[in-house]
Amino acid sequence: MTIDVLKEWWYYFFQCTECRRCSVFCPYGIDTAEITIMGRELLNLLGLNIDWIATPVANCYRTGNHLGIQPHAFKDMLDFFVEDIEDITGLAIEPSFNKKGADILFITPSGDVFADPGTYTCMGYMILFHYLKVKYNLEVTWSTYASEGGNFGFFTSHETMKRLNSKMYAEAKRLGVKWILGGECGHMWRVIHQYMDTLNGPADFLETPVSPITGTRFENAASTKMVHIAEFTADLIKHNKLELDKSRNDGKIVTFHDSCNPSRGMGLLEEPRYIIKETCNQFYEMPSNTIREQTFCCGSGAGLNAGENMELRLAGGLPRANAVKYVHEKHGVNMLGCICAIDRAALPTLMEYWVPEVDVTGVHELVANALVLPGEKERETDLRGDPLKSMEGDDAE
């Protein structure tokens, strides 16, 4: 082992986004991401890591989220969203925090709370939970302790991953909820779906998740007791439990990027598409060899979403950008949907460089735009403050 060999290892293991696309095509069935994970763990034991990974890990262990935000500041951010939502809907919603005896604990990546366009996805969660509380008396609570769904321990070591993951079960047990609902994230769900049960389980103090609104039993979460919000919302829509006005998303011509970990890591392929089709009038798929199990990555996963990696990120994301450009030129697509916080952080930069006419959105931003809330005022804008297409027509008259 020499310094030159260490440098070679470093360059190899920290240019892999752990997207696992290569494993789909490998004739020997080799999962390169698992090799990368072990290689990074060895490097981490030598003290070799990057700040964009190491600092969030330390922050998450210390305060519960990657940014090191204290509980009161986390609540303050959601209070800001409450004000924005009131401006748009005329309703003053009241999110629940750390509520013992709530039905469900909701945990999402902190990127949705602190960075655009994830903030609009976060507002989408809040609007959905308000609707479910008013219509069905469902109590979903946020935690200021387990305030991070993402797990950068996945990019350092299995032991760190286990420590950071443990706070979810600890908080669920403290609050006495029935089960856990998880937000739109990528590697968060690889950890939950493939590692969580053996890392920190069994979670026998929680119930097997059953929707109290539709009665659906979420068999995929029977072991972990944690349900993906896309599966939860798709089930609500399928059972006609949400009143939706698709026309509010007119003007958004949407395509969908299968985030690597929810697609290849857990098979969540149909639910996000179903939600988009039920909330938007215009949806187009990218070429078949660039989506679903064969999806291209954003180029910035596995902790590579840092400014000093910009050239690597833009090159790594070019295949995805090319597929977006294809549907943009063919169908006029102007909105790229996804269910991953790192995607929402990385894809705007990628689109700005390669396909600047296309914006990025989370799926639950689209849900909240379309959701008709009891007692709301007539909506004039979407969650971003952009005029609805119907309002633009009125202005023209």
How does the language model describe each region?
Residues 1-200, 204-209, 384-397:
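Iron-sulfur-cluster electron-transfer modules
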Residues 136, 141-143, 237-242, 249-312:
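Redox- and metal-dependent alpha/beta enzyme cores, enriched for Fe-S-associated oxidoreductases
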Residues 160-164, 241-257, 303-315, 377-397:
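A polyampholytic, Gly/Pro-enriched intrinsically disordered region
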Residues 265, 294-297, 306-307, 343-349, ...:
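Short active-site-adjacent structural elements
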Residues 311-334, 345:
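A short, acidic, amphipathic alpha-helical segment used as a generic capping/interface helix at domain edges
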